[in-house]
């Protein structure tokens, strides 16, 4: 049992401060308490990622990071503040709207005294507005009274006027609806004879100081406003001859109206900003103008565990070790071990590279940032490098953490291949990635995982130790691994007990894990379509064919002659394969059209998943591919060969060219390799060998093709009887499988199913012939009866004579009379 320093200090204190009788009891209690704490820690580590109890608690074995902040906290605070401002703005709009009114809203208002230098206007809504400033002046033109006043506002004074018709009687100015009460069109007001100055003496009396004659008259003058009167208008200015322009309406400007004039712009800006943020979130942050330079990585939340991954046990163990290091780093630090800074997964598509990354995300109790390699680059220069920095900064704040870059070949390909501007810009992103992984500013506590299908195109600096220390190749599964994958994906499917998953795995060589999952899914859909409660071998066979060549096109109209030629073509593949050593075993032949293929032959290796292939195996594959064309030539002639061998010739050409230029299997060309690797192909670069060598390669390819075709032609010529039996079986059954093919090969006769189908068709043909014959006989008899009826009608009728009616016919009149007597 190992103790840390703190536990050793506690034990030492117990030994010093307790007597010998109590030492053991205290020590036992301490051990019990320590074991409980360790059990709690272990349970929290073993708890799955989707458990609801401790999802939000940090792992006890993980070191706390003081720099780590709750993600999105500042953003939530900012958005809360913006929402509060918007709500308060709307409330202010509602409240302040009650304090804004225009002159046209005045109803039965009156002037009352308010101090010595201001007037108060009271409206029908019991709202009061104070008009302050210099003493107002009354002008009169014709019979119109103009009350001019100055209003104090935020930025100075507004010149305002009240227009009303007036008739003076007993020092009282009565206001009525005159011709100018609505203002009419804009007119110039000349400064006319001054009638009176309105002064307030503080006692509530309004005096009329001067009249038309210049004399002063005392007494109170009252001004009442009519309810239908346009009562206030703003003067736009004074001219040099003291004239002024009066608009047709006027509104009072208050503090509320100023706020209301600005508030719509604030609301509009807030709505636009909010909409742009929502658009950025809806698009995953890709097209948001506010996050051009930010990383597009997301925190992955996966429910996939290592127990859900089958068929790649060695690769899984490599990643389990990394997850264990993240959970228990002290165990490795005690031994002086350094965790790999980077792990790259490479292999063919569909083999489970991304699935392994999901399992790491589900098992690890650390933040897992997932991003695609193409998400770094954008239309702006320098965005890629900026996003790389932002990604690693996020990961460091959450350390220990894992970064997973899917399809890293889009950002980490070899530098300087084409020496173009676009290439140099892409190199900036790669250089920043190299610096972040292992540069002067190396970030600790961050592990980088990546996946690619093309390891050969990646830059060497990216693959060196210190960046991607561990390279894990994920290959296609062998037969045992395919069985394990099928069992994993069949856990939630109702598969019949009669189905042999090992047989399905044997018939699917070269299938990836994704293809095997697709086979089971297609079989499930077919079972549902056929109203079956379980999945049987028939559905799985059809699903394999659908994955290989697509769905069957049974409604396609194909003539009998085309079917015969397709059958001879496929039979040629099968016969050459059966008589060629090292060739693949024929599992199935069909002439049902699927996809672009009019028919196909399914072959599997005799020995599953060979690590290497011999020259004889490759030559046997080429001969089998050429068997279809040879069979057509033998049975139809050179002038009647078809285009059905196009795909066969394409595959055979690739095999032969690889034998000559890559594998060194040609004695004339030699061992030199003239086949460039995939990552170094440059469309602007010429061939790296001479023209004479190129001609030699072409001649050698042509020689191998000629030899293999003659070999296939010879086999089909010798065993053409078997070819014809296979063709007849295909025309009867459309699809034959391995037991039926082996029966034909062994006994040189039709299999049982073909004979039964042939007998059924013969009986059907006999029945159709009988029906056709009976129909003809019935038609003939009916024709004879009609002729006899015609003859009877033509015969001479005679009551006394019993002789045959060979006499000439009577006159029509006599016949008609005798008929009448009858």
From Swiss-Prot:
Q: Which cell locations does it reside in?
A: Cell membrane
Q: What does this protein do?
A: Acts as a processive, ATP-dependent zinc metallopeptidase for both cytoplasmic and membrane proteins. Plays a role in the quality control of integral membrane proteins.
Q: How does it sit in the membrane?
A: Multi-pass membrane protein
Q: Which residues bind ATP?
A: 347-354
Q: Where does Zn(2+) bind?
A: 569, 573, 648
Return the protein name.
Answer: ATP-dependent zinc metalloprotease FtsH
Gene name? Answer: ftsH
Keyword Endoplasmic reticulum present in the record's keywords: the answer is no
- The principal localisation class reads membrane
PANTHER family the record matches: AFG3 LIKE MATRIX AAA PEPTIDASE SUBUNIT 2, ISOFORM A, ATP-DEPENDENT PROTEASE
Q: Which regions of this chain are Cytoplasmic-facing, per the record's topological domains?
A: 1-76, 273-822
Feature: compositional bias, Polar residues:
44-54
**Alphabetized GO MF terms:** ATP binding; ATP hydrolysis activity; ATP-dependent peptidase activity; metalloendopeptidase activity; zinc ion binding
Where do the TM regions start and end?
A: 77-97, 252-272
Similarity section: In the central section; belongs to the AAA ATPase family.
Q: Extract the SMART domains matched here.
A: AAA (SM00382)
- Taken from the record, one Pfam family name reads Peptidase_M41
Quote the biased-composition stretches of kind Low complexity, using this chain's numbering.
796-805
Q: Name the InterPro entries for this protein.
A: AAA+_ATPase (IPR003593), AAA_lid_3 (IPR041569), ATP-dep_Zn_Metalloprotease (IPR050928), ATPase_AAA_core (IPR003959), ATPase_AAA_CS (IPR003960), FtsH (IPR005936), P-loop_NTPase (IPR027417), Peptidase_M41 (IPR000642)
CDD domains, per database record: RecA-like_FtsH
- The Enzyme Commission number assigned here is 3.4.24.-
Q: Give an example GO biological process.
A: proteolysis
Catalytic residues (UniProt): 570
Cofactor binding, note field: Binds 1 zinc ion per subunit.
């Amino acid at each position: 049992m190992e103790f840390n320093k703190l536990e050793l200090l506690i034990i030492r204190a117990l030994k010093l401060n307790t007597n010998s009788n109590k030492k053991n009891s205290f020590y036992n209690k301490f051990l019990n308490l320590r074991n409980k704490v360790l059990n709690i820690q272990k349970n929290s580590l073993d708890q799955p990622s989707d458990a609801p109890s401790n999802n939000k608690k940090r792992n006890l074995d993980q070191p706390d990071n003081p720099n780590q902040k709750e993600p999105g906290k500042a953003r939530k605070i900012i958005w809360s503040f913006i929402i509060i401002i918007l709500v308060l703005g709307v409330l202010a709009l509602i409240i302040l709207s009650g304090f804004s009114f225009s002159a046209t809203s005045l109803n039965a208002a009156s002037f009352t005294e308010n101090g010595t230098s201001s007037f108060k206007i009271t409206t029908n809504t019991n709202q009061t507005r104070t008009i302050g400033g210099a003493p107002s002046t009354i002008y009169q033109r014709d019979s119109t009274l103009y009350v001019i006043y100055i209003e104090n506002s935020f930025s100075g004074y507004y010149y305002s006027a009240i227009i009303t018709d007036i008739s003076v009687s007993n020092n009282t100015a009565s206001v009525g609806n005159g011709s100018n009460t609505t203002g009419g069109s804009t007119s110039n007001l000349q400064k006319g004879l001054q009638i009176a100055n309105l002064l307030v003496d503080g006692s509530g009396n309004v005096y009329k100081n001067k009249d038309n004659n210049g004399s002063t008259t005392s007494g109170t003058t009252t001004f009442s406003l009519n309810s239908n009167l346009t009562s206030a208008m703003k003067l736009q200015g004074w001219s040099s001859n003291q004239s002024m322009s009066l608009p047709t309406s006027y509104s009072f400007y208050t503090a509320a109206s100023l706020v209301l004039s600005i508030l719509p712009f604030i609301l509009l800006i807030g709505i636009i900003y909010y909409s742009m943020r929502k658009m950025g979130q809806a698009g995953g942050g890709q097209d948001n103008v506010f996050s051009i330079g930010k990383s597009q990585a997301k925190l992955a939340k996966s429910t996939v565990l290592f127990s859900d991954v089958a068929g790649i046990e060695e690769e899984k163990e490599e990643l389990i070790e990394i997850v264990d290091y993240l959970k228990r780093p002290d165990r490795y630090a005690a031994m002086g071990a350094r965790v790999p800074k980077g792990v790259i997964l490479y292999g063919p598509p569909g083999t489970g590279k991304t699935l392994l990354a999901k399992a790491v995300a589900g098992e690890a109790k650390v933040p897992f940032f997932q991003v695609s390699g193409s998400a770094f680059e954008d239309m702006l220069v320098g965005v890629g490098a900026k996003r790389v920095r932002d990604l690693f900064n996020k990961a460091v704040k959450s350390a220990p953490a894992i970064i997973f870059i899917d399809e890293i070949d889009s950002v980490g390909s070899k530098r300087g291949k084409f020496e173009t501007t676009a290439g140099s810009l892409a190199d900036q992103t790669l250089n920043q990635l190299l610096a972040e992984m292992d540069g002067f500013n190396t970030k600790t506590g961050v592990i980088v995982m990546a996946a690619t299908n093309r390891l050969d195109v990646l830059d060497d600096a990216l693959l060196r130790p210190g960046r991607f220390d561990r390279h894990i190749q994920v290959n296609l599964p062998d037969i045992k691994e395919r069985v394990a994958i099928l069992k994993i994906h069949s856990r939630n499917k109702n598969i019949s007990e009669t189905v042999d998953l090992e047989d399905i795995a044997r018939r699917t060589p070269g299938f990836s894990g994704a293809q095997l999952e697709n086979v089971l899914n297609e079989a499930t859909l077919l079972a549902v379509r056929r109203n079956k409660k379980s999945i049987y071998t028939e559905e799985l066979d059809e699903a394999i064919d659908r994955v290989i060549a697509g769905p069957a096109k049974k409604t396609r109209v194909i003539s009998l002659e085309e079917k015969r030629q397709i059958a001879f073509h496929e039979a040629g593949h099968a016969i050459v394969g059966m008589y060629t050593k090292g060739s693949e075993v024929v599992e199935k032949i069909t002439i049902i059209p699927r996809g672009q293929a009019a028919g196909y032959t399914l072959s599997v290796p005799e020995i599953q998943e060979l690590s290497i292939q011999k020259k004889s195996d490759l030559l046997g594959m080429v001969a089998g591919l050429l068997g279809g064309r040879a069979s057509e030539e033998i049975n139809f002639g050179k002038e009647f060969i078809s285009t059905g061998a196009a795909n066969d010739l394409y595959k055979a050409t690739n095999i032969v060219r690889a034998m000559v230029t890559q594998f060194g299997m040609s004695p004339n060309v030699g061992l030199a390799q003239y086949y460039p690797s995939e990552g170094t192909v440059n469309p602007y670069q010429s061939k790296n060998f001479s023209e004479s060598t190129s001609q030699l390669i072409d001649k050698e390819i042509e020689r191998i093709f000629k030899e293999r075709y003659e070999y296939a032609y010879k086999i089909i010529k010798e065993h053409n009887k078997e070819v014809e039996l296979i063709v007849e079986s295909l025309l009867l059954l459309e699809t034959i499988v391995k037991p039926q093919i082996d029966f034909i090969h062994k006994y040189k006769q039709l299999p049982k199913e073909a004979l039964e189908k042939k007998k059924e068709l013969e009986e059907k043909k006999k029945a159709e012939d009988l029906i056709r014959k009976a129909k003809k006989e019935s038609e003939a008899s009916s024709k004879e009866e009609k002729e006899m009826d015609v003859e009877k009608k033509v015969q001479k009728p005679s009551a006394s004579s019993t002789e045959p009616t060979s006499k000439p016919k009577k006159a029509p009149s006599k016949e008609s009379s005798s008929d009448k007597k009858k």
